[in-house]
Amino acid sequence: MIINFKKRGSKNFINLLIFLSVGFAQQSSHQYIEYQRIQNRLQQGWNTWNTSSVLQQVLLPQGFAINLAFKQHYFLEEQYLSSALIGRRGDFTETVRPGPHAYDGSYTQLEIQWEGLDARIETAHAGKDLVILISPNSIPHDRMKVIIESGMLWNRQGHLSRKINQLKAVCPGKIIKVFTTSVPVDDDPYIDVKTPYLAVWLDGEIGISTGKKRTLLEIKKAIEIQKVSLQSEAEKFGELAEAYIAVQAGIAWNLIYEPKFDRVVSTVGRLWNEEYGGFCTFGWDNFFLAYMTGLASRDLAFSNVIEHLRGKTEQGFIPNDNRGNGSKSFDRSQPPVGGIMVKEVYKTYPEDWFLKATFDDLLGWNRWWHRSRNNEGLLSYGSSPANNPFNEPVFETKTAAGYESGMDDSPMYIGVPFNKKKHTLELQDVGLTSLYIADCRALAEMAGILKRKKEQKELES
């Protein structure tokens, strides 16, 4: 249909634009609304959302935090542990041994050792409340305090206060109270805390609860309920139940709320997040994380895929790493497993909107490989000329090409030169080419479902 705008007048033209814009908005908002619902569901309740410490529980969407810190009292020097991370190294650092961790934070358990501290810390949901149990494996020789800190994160609105033996947070639409089974001590004003807190001696088991004051017995019962629930969920995997609990824990301890883009997303490790400005996602790792979370959670699987694809470069490829400080690996990608993993997630949760939301980004990445890494008929890993605003030293080197492979300094690349004219290793990589073919087949299958005949033909040729 041809419309004569001059004949029909500017008013009709404006009305048509409004009609068309509404139509397009409805078409695109179908994906946005569905995905926003996913994020709204994920951003609820207590969990180890803050990447800065595994000893901190945060309530979303309010952003209220309960942080556990420890103060060691020596006769001369005193030490203060305000945060803890898994795998941290160095003198006088904490050692954290992670235990089970449900994706939704309904149960977590870890062991921590530091400067005489040796304890197990468990947390659990009790309805919409949180309970925490600190169980010392031994009483420290030198006296130690547990500091129960309150906090409001990410500039969320709230008012914090302490009244005798409880903490209180007043947030929009919600009041949170925090209690402890131990007797608070106020003999030490020299504590490195800038918000209301409770300090108690670590001379036995310590219980912490929100909502209402609970006894140690009540806290232990709430924890046991969630432990049993986690075990029951794992039993559907049969003889692999314990393996599933371990895999879930490994992923869940690195699941965070990422405030820069207002999202819940899996990361590879909190130490990486700390080093790279708040978060770090990796080219192929995060697609594997999406697949693994999909064994139990549709919402996490979809979120991990969609958020990872949002990190693509202007050239259309998924970078080796994507960092919270704004830096990316602008010169290199990682193995093309995205289409394969997304197809597997779709097989578990066959929702066409999910394919529509991801297909074009995956196709763009697929085309980039053929365009940028074709080395006389087969593919090779490499590192391309690119803007380097953060002055990363490895651009256009063999080292960077190794990073693109995901195998970094593998012995397979000993003696293989880097061709600076081709920007690739002088190695036609059968493994990479095979993954690329598998990616083409996965995307062709997706194109067929979406009735994208032209793209399907391209991918099958």
Each PLM stretch: what is its role?
Residues 2-4, 8, 13, 17-18, ...:
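Terminal accessory carbohydrate-recognition/targeting modules of carbohydrate-active enzymes
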Residues 22, 257-261, 375:
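Intrinsically disordered or highly flexible coil/loop and linker segments, enriched in small
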Residues 23-24, 297, 451-452:
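Hydrophobic alpha-helical membrane context
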Residues 51-54, 358, 365:
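Internal, well-ordered alpha-helical segments in soluble enzyme and binding-protein domains
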Residues 198-210, 315, 319-337, 343-353, ...:
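The feature captures the catalytic groove of carbohydrate-active enzymes
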Residues 237-348, 355, 363, 428-430, ...:
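Substrate-binding groove/exosite segments of carbohydrate-active enzymes
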